[in-house]
Amino acid sequence: VTLIRHEEEAAAGLDFGSIATTVMLRLGEKTQPAALPEGLYGRLLGHSEEAWLTDEFLSEQLDASTCYSVMEMFGDEPEKWRGVLQDGHIYAPRSLTALLNKPSRSLYYDLKWSDENYALRCLRLFLKQVMLQTSLAALLSGAPALSWRVSMPGALPPYRQEAYLEMVRGLAREVAKETGMPLSARFPAVLYALENQADGWYFLSRSEVDARGGDLNLDIGGSTADLSLWLGGKNHAAAESSLLL
């Protein structure tokens, strides 16, 4: 029997990166990883503790809120890639050695920047699996509803930013319908910001910078470096840049 306490609505912050993706949950003033409890990393086959469903499907770290932005697909026909965990899954290797020994033909990455049809199909399944797992984590944390926060680097072409936002909005509705975890009625289902804005607002809200003076934020990712200057406690950057690496 699992007792679920009633908490405030959850906001999920989804940081989708070129190499790895991290998701955190905020419930009121509490922030925590969007991780699943140990019992849900159980056994698929057999009844012994040796038959864990961790190999490549789920991270061995029970509190992990970060995964590689890599999909393993079970077939080579992209038009048939429709179902999460049925046609492909987020690849979670046990070790770097396991990753190096994995046949590369079944692994798909560069999901953030590629315009290819197969990559966009992979991206949709990747984001849906992340959002399904996050919704379950929010439910088990006692949240009655959920909203999403996402960001993208300014260096990403505007049409790609818009396409990404529309994909997340559609998936938010789809995941809410499939899981029964409702979207928030108090906040927009999906809020979007450029990564420079998201970084600056985060540090201002945490009171980790000198609001009377200024601070310089540098966010180095797998494909971009986002730089912004914040002065006088204002809620917008005085200057900013997003550079491709």
Predicted regions, residues:
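Generic recognition of stable, solvent-exposed alpha-helical segments in well-folded globular domains
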Residues: 16, 118, 122-125, 159-163, ...
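Short glycine-rich, Thr/Ser-proximal phosphate-binding strand/loop in the N-terminal lobe
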Residues: 28-57, 77, 233-245
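Eukaryote-specific, cytoplasm-facing alpha-helical/coiled-coil scaffolding segments in long proteins
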Residues: 47-48, 158, 226
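Glycine-rich phosphate-binding loop and adjoining helix at the ATP-binding site
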Residues: 150-198
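Short helix-terminating capping/connector loops at secondary-structure junctions
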Residues: 6-7, 138-145, 180-187, 209-212
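Gly/Thr-rich phosphate-binding beta-strand-loop-beta motif of the actin/hexokinase/Hsp70
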Residues: 3-31, 204-238
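Phosphate/ATP-binding catalytic cores across multiple sugar-kinase/actin-like superfamilies
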Residues: 2-3, 122-141, 196-211
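Conserved phosphate-binding loops in N-terminal lobes of ATP-dependent enzymes
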Residues: 49-152
